[in-house]
Amino acid sequence: MSFTFNWPRFSDQFHYDAMQMLNTALNKGNKPPIIADKIEVVELEMGTQPPELEIRDIGDLTVDQFRGIFRLTYAGDAHLVLKTKVQANPLNHKQPDIHLMVGSGGMLAAKQPLVVPMLLRLSHFRLSSYVVLVVSKQKGITLVFKTDPLQNVDINSTFDSIAVIQKFIQREIEGQLRQMFREDLPGIIHRLSQQWVKAKVEAPYLSKHPPPPIPPEEISEPGDYGEEGEFPFGSPPNHHSLDPDPKIVLRPSLNNASIHQLSTLSHSNHTLSPYTRSLSHFTVRSVPPRGIGPSGLSASFERQPVKAKRKRTYRLGGRKPPPESVPAVPDSPERASSPIPPSEFDESDMDRYFRSYDDHSRPPNIRQYRSHLHPS
């Protein structure tokens, strides 16, 4: 079984993220004493030649996840450029393996620190190792090296003219690279793959544009209810109809008078107050309508009042006693302007149940009471 790798030019965002992660990995932990400043990645190029994978074992193979053991071989043209500052005075460096002045009789250099900038170029990587590769659509890519992958790397620096320093830098950089392949590179690949998986998931939604804002609809006036857009009261309105230009918009009117009337109506329903203002499209059963006709009263006032269902009248005599004459009280000018609707209670019942002050002041006449029970 063979694989064909698609190894295109990586995006600028990928290079930027990889450089930031390499900066963090190279400056982690204790650096050699010859390094006098932080290590910064200046240039990163992934090259044009892909690595080679030889299948050794397939452990898990599903639609969303793949796990296998491979033999990785890479001999491409990728390169890396680093920038840092080093301690150039060999006597200030306490390593016994640097002997720059071998054979000198007694000539010594100054023991003052001498920090100079340095550029490092790492190229011609040769990698060969057994790796465990796990590819998951949800968790990303996990790559673990089972053996030391670094076989060879060419390191060019500012001090290539000095052979001793060039060998020392070569040895130090190779040690740092082996540690990075073993500890830091699997984490870098995993974090980069998580960003790649996240971009794959979010990519279909990036092409979708948000829906256009809904234009503000006009608020209908009370006079618009009689037009074509009015729905019949026998059937409820269809709120899900796709009418491009609705005539009626079910929104509260921003009228202070209407709000005040609704507040009065709500207050009267809570307190059972009969003094409620009449509202259009509302029916209040506490009082009859207050419309005034040409005769001074409404048409409902001219007919006989309907007595309440719970009203009960108890009469002790066989016939209704003649009503007592009540002196007419002249109406005041204020009352003459507003006619009073007829009462639903009989005056005889009111005289019987609500007696005058004189009747309450003296004891009742038993004979008169009996005469009412047994009329002659």
From Swiss-Prot:
User: Where is the sequence biased in composition, kind Basic and acidic residues?
Assistant: 350-362
Q: Which residues form the SMP-LTD domain?
A: 1-194
- Which CDD domains is this protein grouped with? SMP_Mdm34
Q: Where is the signal peptide?
A: none
Q: How does it sit in the membrane?
A: Multi-pass membrane protein
Record's keyword terms, sorted: Lipid transport, Lipid-binding, Membrane, Mitochondrion, Mitochondrion outer membrane, Transmembrane, Transmembrane beta strand, Transport
GO annotations of cellular component type: ERMES complex
- What is the superkingdom listed in this entry's lineage? Eukaryota
Q: Protein transport among the record's keywords?
A: no
Any idea where this protein resides? Mitochondrion outer membrane
* Region listing for Disordered, in residue ranges: 207-249, 286-376
Where does the record place Acidic residues bias? Answer: 218-230
One GO-annotated biological process of the protein: mitochondrial genome maintenance
Give residue spans, biased composition: Basic residues.
Answer: 306-318
Q: Where mainly located? A: mitochondrion
| PANTHER family registered for this protein in UniProt | MITOCHONDRIAL DISTRIBUTION AND MORPHOLOGY PROTEIN 34
Q: What is known of its domains?
A: Lacks alpha-helical transmembrane segments, suggesting that it resides in the membrane via beta-sheet conformations similar to those predicted for other outer membrane proteins and porin.
Family indicated by similarity: Belongs to the MDM34 family.
Q: Which HAMAP family match?
A: Mdm34 (MF_03105)
Q: What does this protein do?
A: Component of the ERMES/MDM complex, which serves as a molecular tether to connect the endoplasmic reticulum (ER) and mitochondria. Components of this complex are involved in the control of mitochondrial shape and protein biogenesis, and function in nonvesicular lipid trafficking between the ER and mitochondria. MDM34 is required for the interaction of the ER-resident membrane protein MMM1 and the outer mitochondrial membrane-resident beta-barrel protein MDM10.
Name of the molecule in the record: Mitochondrial distribution and morphology protein 34
Q: From which organism does this entry originate?
A: Laccaria bicolor (strain S238N-H82 / ATCC MYA-4686)
Q: What's the gene?
A: MDM34
